[in-house]
């Protein structure tokens, strides 16, 4: 019966004026239409839009359902950031020290390997042949004479 009276009052007012009763109608029509499962979905999709429309209308009627929606939103908000923060923190901490620890010994072993064979052992060739490939290629190209043929 109340909805019938509200509708007649809304139609009696000019179009420029919008009474608070119509806002209450909007919230009342949305609340029964949305079951608890859909309330969570709508809260996830648009949490900001539901709160402002429900709060200024009538705090007495929609209070229990808005409180439930707010509780659901609070629970969802507290659950979502916590796992994300926990997942990123452990991944970052162990990920950074492991590669650094692996790389440092590799460089040390390479340096010791290059330093150790620098001194020729018995029966080995001199260290000149142990030059890097780039140096050997440069010396080979510079030492080879270029033959020009005159015709």
Swiss-Prot record:
What does the entry's PTM section describe? Answer: The N-terminus is blocked.
Compositional bias (Low complexity) at which positions? 36-45, 53-64, 134-144
Q: Which residues carry this modification: N-acetylalanine?
A: 2
Q: Where is this region: Disordered?
A: 1-151
Q: Which UniProt keywords apply?
A: Acetylation, Allergen
Q: Where is the composition biased (Basic and acidic residues)?
A: 17-31, 65-80, 103-113, 122-133
Superkingdom, according to UniProt? Eukaryota
What family is reported? To kiwi fruit protein PKIWI501.
**Protein's name in the database:** Major latex allergen Hev b 5
């Amino acid at each position: 019966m109340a909805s019938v009276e509200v509708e007649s009052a809304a139609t009696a007012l000019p179009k420029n004026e919008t009474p608070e009763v119509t806002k209450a109608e909007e919230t009342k029509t949305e609340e029964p239409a949305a079951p608890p499962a859909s309330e969570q979905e709508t809260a996830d999709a648009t949490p900001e839009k539901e709160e402002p429309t429900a709060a200024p209308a009538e705090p007495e009627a929609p209070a229990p359902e808005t409180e439930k929606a707010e509780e659901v939103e609070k629970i969802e908000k507290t659950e979502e950031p916590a796992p994300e923060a926990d997942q990123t923190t452990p991944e970052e901490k162990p990920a950074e020290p492991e590669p650094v620890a692996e790389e440092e010994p590799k460089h040390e072993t390479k340096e010791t390997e290059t330093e150790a064979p620098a001194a020729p052992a018995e029966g080995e060739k001199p260290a000149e042949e142990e030059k890097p490939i780039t140096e050997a290629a440069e010396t080979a190209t510079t030492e080879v004479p270029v033959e020009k043929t005159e015709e």
